[in-house]
From Swiss-Prot:
Cofactor(s) this protein requires: Zn(2+)
Ranges that cross the membrane: 5-25, 28-48, 146-166, 174-194
Co-factor note (free text): Binds 1 zinc ion per subunit.
Entry's localization field: Cell inner membrane
Native source organism of the sequence: Acidiphilium cryptum (strain JF-5)
Top-level taxonomy: Bacteria, Pseudomonadati, Pseudomonadota, Alphaproteobacteria, Acetobacterales
Record protein name field: Protease HtpX homolog
Length: 287
């Protein structure tokens, strides 16, 4: 199944799950409100998601004078990829990480943390930037942002529904009450699994395209391992407060528990590194 169709079906599943929760809360009216809320959320995500997520992480514009290495790398690789240079931002956070956002290549931005700039060498930084540019080129940024918006909304409405309960008819029926409780408890987990299904193929593809763009798959592999290792013990408090946005980052920014790791929105680093090492056996720059 083509990735575009598969992603569309998964996003439709998220919307259906959101509407189902609305139906449990208020039957037909609740479902209609949930559908309208989902549509409005996606509309807002399309137009202002980049500004919202950048503000959420306190990202500041990176200028050439303060961050010459970063800006030069982004401009060089964007030109090589045939993309307009995205806006570049820096987040004051010790955890090395990065993400891209924006509805299309003409309205895109790349944000990196100060921890990333201090932890990676030139080749490794180029690999990370190329990875994010790949997301921009193939409009993964829009897909991941809309998915994160829906997943976050599902978690929020599930918590509200558990607190306030469903309709009177639902509360009067033990079976309906149990079924509804299961729906509300499992909905956020299901949303995370859908995020994982969308993210997995897109992260692998972005890794491969980044390696092809730079011609240095091992540099990206080293970067992924270093980011993953440091993310385990260097917290990202903003990401912990907004876990639905974790899928935007190149490496999962959440410290988490073993249970959380099982349902992380990123494919395992060891698998990503193994694929890059396999690519290194060939002249990826000619692919």
């Amino acid at each position: 199944m083509p990735n575009l169709i598969r992603t569309g079906l998964l996003m439709a599943a998220l919307t259906a799950l959101f509407v189902a929760i609305g139906y449990w809360i208020g039957r037909g009216a609740g479902a209609a409100i949930a559908l309208a809320f989902a549509a409005a959320g996606n509309f807002v995500a399309y137009w202002v998601s980049d500004r919202a997520v950048l503000a959420m992480y306190g990202a500041q514009p990176a200028n050439q004078a303060a961050f010459p290495r970063l800006v030069a790398q982004v401009d060089r690789l964007a030109s090589k990829a045939g993309l307009p240079p995205p806006r570049v931002y820096v987040i004051d956070n010790d955890q090395p990480n990065a993400f891209a956002t924006g509805r299309n290549p003409q309205h895109a931005a790349i944000a990196v943390t100060t921890g990333l700039l201090g932890a990676l060498d030139e080749a490794e930084l180029a690999g990370v930037i190329a990875h994010e540019l790949s997301h921009i080129r193939h409009r993964d940024t829009l897909t991941m942002t809309v998915t994160a918006t829906l997943a976050g909304a599902i978690g929020m409405i599930s918590n509200l529904a558990i607190f306030f309960g469903g309709s009177d008819e639902r509360r009067s029926s033990p079976f309906a009450g149990i079924a509804g409780l299961l729906l509300l408890l499992l909905a956020p987990l299901t949303a995370t699994l859908v995020q994982l299904a969308i993210s997995r193929t897109r992260e692998y593809a972005a890794d491969a395209r980044a390696a092809s763009l730079t011609g240095q798959p091992l540099a990206l592999a080293r970067a992924l391992m270093r980011i993953d290792e440091m993310a385990r013990w260097v917290p990202n408090d903003d990401a912990e407060r907004n876990p639905a946005t974790a899928s935007l980052f190149i490496v999962n920014p959440l410290s988490g528990t073993t249970f959380d790791t099982l349902f992380a929105t990123h494919p395992p680093i060891r698998e990503r590194v193994a694929r890059l090492r396999h690519m290194a056996q060939f002249d990826v720059s000619k692919n």
